């Protein structure tokens, strides 16, 4: 689905080489604090393998989290970030965007289930994020969501902060013919057989929803002997 598509694009060599890519899913988030924690954790996890220089740049910007990030005598980072470390979400959010603006490479940030921010306890979260996004020239954002009507209201209603601030893309279901070709090809490569009618049944049963179709086809693949 949309998550797999975004992650797939992030793996393109020209993207991996020239950008920092961050992906967070905020479906379970209930507050700005949850969002800030998810974003902070993702940035740390992405930067750590890159090296101490990249991580140190984030560390210098995010003063409110410095107690959770330490460096040993060899300069290797140690991360111990928990939700409880986000004591002042608004402050940490400001610091994160300061980092994104100053990062040594452009940043791509994907936020999945973005519609969740409409239910946060804090007021004006949409307006706050819109302001930061608007003024962050070193980053581009992908806002994905599964509740199409909520996402539509956020970006198409004139009174909402994100009105006309993005290019909208609706992802339709992958055509049945593509699933047939894809599934039968992989079964055949493994010396297995898959009837096209079975693919049709799975597709119709789950109304073209990618996650369910792939899950069932994968199960059938593992159950089918060569």
Spans of features found by a protein language model:
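An amphipathic alpha-helix signature
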Residues: 33-40, 176-184
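Conserved AAA+ ATPase "SRH/arginine-finger" region at the nucleotide-binding site
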Residues: 167-178
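Short regulatory helix/loop adjacent to the ATP-binding pocket of P-loop NTPases
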Residues: 148-166
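Conserved Walker B catalytic segment
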Residues: 79-147, 156
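Short glycine-/polar-rich loops that comprise or flank the Walker A/P-loop
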Residues: 17-21, 137-139, 164-167
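Short, conserved phosphate/pyrophosphate- and ester-handling motifs at nucleotide-, phospho-/glycolipid
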Residues: 2-3, 209
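P-loop NTPase nucleotide-binding core
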Residues: 3-108
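Amphipathic alpha-helical "lid/sensor" segments that cap RecA-like P-loop NTPase cores
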Residues: 184-226
């Amino acid at each position: 689905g949309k998550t797999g598509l975004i992650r797939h694009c992030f793996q393109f060599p020209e993207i991996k080489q020239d950008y920092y890519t961050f992906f967070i899913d905020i479906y379970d988030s209930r507050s700005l604090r949850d969002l800030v924690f998810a974003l902070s954790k993702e940035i740390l996890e992405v930067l750590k393998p890159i090296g101490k220089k990249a991580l140190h740049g984030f560390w210098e910007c995010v003063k409110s989290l410095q107690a959770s990030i330490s460096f040993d005598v060899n300069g290797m980072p140690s991360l111990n970030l928990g939700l409880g470390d986000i004591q002042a979400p608004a402050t940490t959010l400001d610091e994160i965007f300061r980092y994104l603006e100053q990062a040594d490479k452009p940043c791509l940030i994907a936020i999945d289930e973005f519609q969740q921010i409409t239910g946060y306890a804090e007021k004006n979260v949409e307006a706050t994020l819109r302001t930061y996004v608007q003024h962050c020239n070193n980053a581009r954002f992908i806002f994905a969501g599964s509740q199409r009507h909520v996402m539509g209201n956020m970006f198409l209603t004139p009174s909402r902060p994100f009105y006309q601030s993005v290019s909208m893309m609706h992802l339709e279901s992958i055509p049945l013919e593509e699933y047939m070709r894809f599934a039968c090809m992989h079964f055949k490569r493994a010396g297995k057989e898959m009837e096209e009618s079975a693919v049709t049944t799975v597709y119709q049963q789950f109304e073209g929803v990618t996650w369910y179709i792939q899950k069932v086809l994968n199960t059938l693949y593992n159950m089918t002997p060569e």
